[in-house]
A protein has these predicted regions:
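NAD(P)+-binding Rossmann beta1-loop-alpha1 motif at the extreme N-terminus of oxidoreductases
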Residues: 1-53
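Internal alpha-helical scaffold of NAD(P)-dependent oxidoreductase catalytic cores
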Residues: 17, 40, 102, 117-159, ...
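Amphipathic, non-transmembrane alpha-helical scaffold segments
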Residues: 63, 164-167, 171, 240, ...
Length: 256
């Protein structure tokens, strides 16, 4: 029997989940809600699209895929009770959902946008529910997309989200800084692409502690000093110093 779901939201998460579920033979995607008009990317989905929460019908799972700060308000306005309502946030407690409904979390841990389709077979799903039957339903729903399924409570999920920010968001910003340094000095950034690939490929099989290399790992003060002298951007210089000192401290050396 198909799992009937509704999706609330029109951002990257809502788009990717809609894309994954809308033609799945074991899922009936009933309704897609957003307060305002949906972006053109959603036009390809032959689903009932609504703009008033009062017209949202009950479903086996109602997925709230919106910004963290909007979860509580939307959950209070849902026009039904005692239904399974979940959010998709890594950083928000299950208790953000109004208690008039059965609460849960359906969190796929992956960076998302509307330009690149997510291969959910490679994505871990972190699940939480207040009762066993609801957890099993979320487990079944997640298993339609992935075999990587984890039961995490709200605190564990927030810890995971924090760690993910370091891996994904901060590392991406460091790559951006590298791009800017190359651009400002007319050096082709493409030269660094193989290094970028190797850095993250190596971490699939080696701990970050063991994989660390570079001047800070060697405590090469001459190279570090030369790099700092080359950085005219004070923000970049501060980031370089903070990360360098963190690496030095990690391996038991004295700070700069």
């Amino acid at each position: 029997m198909a799992i009937h779901i509704n999706i609330i939201g029109a951002g990257n998460m809502a788009y990717q989940l809609t894309q994954a579920f809308h033609n799945h033979p074991e899922v009936q995607l009933q309704q897609l809600y957003n307060r305002s008009e949906l972006s053109p990317e959603f036009n390809v989905f032959e689903i009932e699209k609504i703009h008033h929460l009062s017209t949202l019908r009950p479903a086996d799972v109602c997925i709230i895929a919106v910004k963290d700060e909007a979860i509580a308000e939307i959950s209070k306005k849902l026009p039904f009770e005692n239904q399974l309502v979940v959010h998709t946030s890594g950083n928000t407690s299950i208790e953000a959902i109004d208690s008039k409904n059965r609460r849960g979390v359906f969190y796929p841990l992956q960076t998302m946008n509307k330009q690149t389709l997510v291969d959910f077979t490679k994505v871990p799903f972190c699940l939480e529910a207040e009762n066993t039957n609801d957890f099993h339903l979320l487990q079944r729903l997640a298993s339609l997309l992935s075999t990587k399924i984890y039961a995490l409570n709200s605190y564990q999920r927030r810890v995971l989200h924090l760690a993910a920010v370091f891996i994904n968001n901060f590392s991406n910003h460091l790559v951006y800084i590298s791009e800017q340094i190359c651009k400002e000095n007319e050096v082709p950034f493409e030269i660094l692409q193989p290094l970028l690939t190797e850095t993250f490929t190596k971490l699939q099989n080696t701990s970050a502690y063991d994989a660390q290399t570079g001047p800070a790992r060697r405590n090469d003060s001459l190279t570090i000093g030369n790099h700092l002298a080359m950085l005219d951007n004070n923000n970049y210089k501060e980031i370089y110093e903070i990360i360098t000192n963190s690496i030095i401290n990690t391996y038991g050396r004295k700070e700069l």
